[in-house]
Amino acid sequence: MMTTALTPFSARHIGPGVNDVRAMLAVIGVPSVETLISQAVPQSIRLDLPLTLPAPASEAEALAELSAIMAKNTVLKSFIGAGYHGVHVPPVIQRNLFENPAWYTAYTPYQAEISQGRLEMLFNFQTLVTELTGLPVASASLLDEATAVAEAVGIALRHHRDKRTKVAFAGTPHPQTLDVVRTRAEPLGIEIDGETIDDNTAALLVSWPDTLGVYGDHKAAIDKARAAGALVVFIADPLGLTLTDAPAKLGADIAVGPMQRFGVPMGFGGPHAAYCAVSDRLTRLMPGRLVGQSTDSKGRPGYRLALQTREQHIRRDKATSNICTAQALLANMATAYAIWHGPAGLQAIAGRIHALANRLASGLKAAGVSVLGASRFDTVTVEAKGKAAEIAEAAEKTGRLLRVLDADHVGIAFDETSTDADLDAIASLFGAKAAPSADSTVPGKPRGKEFLTQPVFNENKSETDMMRLLRRLADKDLALDRSMIPLGSCTMKLNAAAEMMPVSWPSIADLHPFAPASHSAGYRAMIGELEGWLSEITGFDAVSLQPNAGSQGEYAGLLAIRAYHRSRGEGHRTVCLIPSSAHGTNPASAAMAGMSVVVVRCLEDGNIDMDDMRAKANEHSKNLAALMFTYPSTHGVYEEGARHLCALIHEHGGQVYFDGANLNALVALARPADIGADVCHMNLHKTFCIPHGGGGPGVGPIGVKAHLKPYLPGHVTEGSAHAVSAAPFGSASILPITWMYIRMMGAAGLKQATETAIISANYVATRLAPHFPLLYKGRHDRIAHECILDTRVLKESAGISVDDIAKRLIDYGFHAPTMSFPVAGTLMVEPTESEPKRELDRFCEAMIAIAGEAAKVARGDWPLADNPLVNAPHTAAETLAGQWTHPYSRLEAAYPAGDADTAAKYWPPVSRIDNVAGDRNLVCSCPPLSDYLGAAE
């Protein structure tokens, strides 16, 4: 279809054109779109009227409208600190990583062979963290500082097998951190017990420095905690760690903190990565992803996700955490910042910040003004003697924001954007002059120069080198900028450039989340509109945008249900019914919310076993808290009895939690609240176009009925509590992506997108059914937006496994569909509405060709031990090897689709990765250069 500047955005977002859709419907065997939708989607849930949303805007109109809204923000220079700091984003990183679709459109690196670039960068992130903390193992990022501290508490509880129930503090953490920890602790019966340490203490949380900016003397508390068997958790500023001793040397078992000030804008609260590092004995208790080094089938080094058996998609309610999506893109950005500056540069930045803080403190003291603490990194807390608000108001008039702690104290946090002019202006507010110089006040022995000695942190200081490093890593990966990613239950749709552009605007990127409310008028207007649109789309009465991942949305929704029952004097309602086919985050979230999980069987056709559901609901009627279910189901079909299911749970006094993972099959056709749900989370990084970022960021807002609205997450800075994320609006700076998508699509465009997603899935299913039976089908043999291909037929006929198929798809230039979920040995395919018909056809032809290759193995044309399927993927080095001994040709290996004359070939950098070896010999960070030098001597 020819497009022009007047073409509606929906026609650019949706891949198949009018003629394509007509051809696809013919293959499916229906005369019209409406016929297919009426066959697939039960009439009982269909919307009677169109959604009430603004008429669609063009890209230019939407950008102009959003720009005008965000211009209402007042972005002053922030000295608020409290975990959020101004940064200079290196342009080479902003342009070549943050704004590069090769980086931001990739999926979580489950398929190691096509993810080596971002796995290598995350491995470098882990190395960075282990070097800063002195602890041997670090994860590949968590969601933010507050949730990272809560996860650290979880590690301590699991370490003590849930037999200890107290958490103590040494130094005061940031208020938002304490609030999130309290939120996590309360459902589990954990007591936040101040400074008291005894034999029931699971963890001591050491703030390094504390929220006042002070490095306290915590040696006695640490010694007491260790004597009592409690784990010591350091909450440490990573930039400050370039100047101080590593937490491990100070007694830490765990260290956590935010990586935001490593080149990631504040963004009104996020997203940014947090880090988590642990001692060796705690490795298997760590939350989130862990990248490890292994080897491929040829003995070459390669990276992979390690120890996945501890994660939610494997262990479910027994998992170490409900974390699924983390902050991979932002962790990669922070790593690039460390690579760009190197250890000397990081120390220079930290040293300059430290000097500014000490010069202010010295100058104030000389003028007779009291400051708190003798040892600090970047923050000076000043005694204002009742004039804190007055001083902050005077600072604001100069274009600077200070932190008012109470009527008598003001906090001033310096960062890499702070200047001598700022220092002088702030000192003058107190009638003082900054000292011309000041001695370092970091505690203990200063960190030396011997850290981050690995070559990657020392060899990329020119922009040419850095640009090429980022390009080299991106070229190793397969993202949406290269080809379709048909992952079922993941909705890898287009992340349009117009949606992404605003994220880099200063009016969006540079605002502190705790700036005065009047300064965030633009953000609050945009957020208010977005909440209203999401309420209209889902049918709920209220929406919270605070949860910064789908897993956190689940948790927030279950906490709302829990609080509702308790408000009615029914705190005994703690049983959560969950179908056996549910996403792994569901049972993990229920366990975190203090609920006990009761699994409900599914039938062979994939539907929930309603007899078992009724029996379980009857059995647990008095204690029933909730049902968690996904719709359409994780089997890719619209179950007929959704309304009856919700009514059944309500009859027994329970609430219905609707998992919105598959909302892309419902938008503008049906609404969860109308079906009977009480709460639902929405993955904005699926249905609403926020990119996956190679494993994050994500946003998982929840919608609730009116009776649950009082129990939505609050925030200490907004006069409430029970937060689930560090910032009031979570990952606020990426919310404009979803705002832009909805604004440009309009109600009709959103409906067309949903219909096209269903058409594309049924088209792929119809084409592939003769070769791979569809495991589940709904009425009229239709599916929703995804299908499960029973690839076990190739295992039975030829010995070819689902792994072999997935790896062979790499040779065809595709990321594999979702493997072995929800059924082992199968592939779940979700094409989304964004893929053009020619790409769908290319995928179908690849799958059909693979079935043909398996037939050759079955006939004996190729031996099972040596064929292009079991040897896949094929690297360029293997294909060009001087001696070729395989029974198939080099062209069959590398260009199975017969496209050797094209320039679009994707070459995997490694052959098949050995997963077992990687877990048996866990290597999760790069050794320092001294290890190599020592080995060579």
From Swiss-Prot:
Reactions mediated catalytically: N(6)-[(R)-lipoyl]-L-lysyl-[glycine-cleavage complex H protein] + glycine + H(+) = N(6)-[(R)-S(8)-aminomethyldihydrolipoyl]-L-lysyl-[glycine-cleavage complex H protein] + CO2
One Pfam family in the UniProt entry: GcvP2_C
Keyword annotations from UniProtKB, A to Z: Oxidoreductase, Pyridoxal phosphate
Enzyme class label: oxidoreductase
GO BP of this protein: glycine decarboxylation via glycine cleavage system
Keyword Secreted: no
One of the record's GO cellular component terms: cytosol
Subunit structure, as described in the record: The glycine cleavage system is composed of four proteins: P, T, L and H.
The protein's name in its UniProt record: Glycine dehydrogenase (decarboxylating)
Lineage: Bacteria, Pseudomonadati, Pseudomonadota, Alphaproteobacteria, Hyphomicrobiales
Originating gene: gcvP
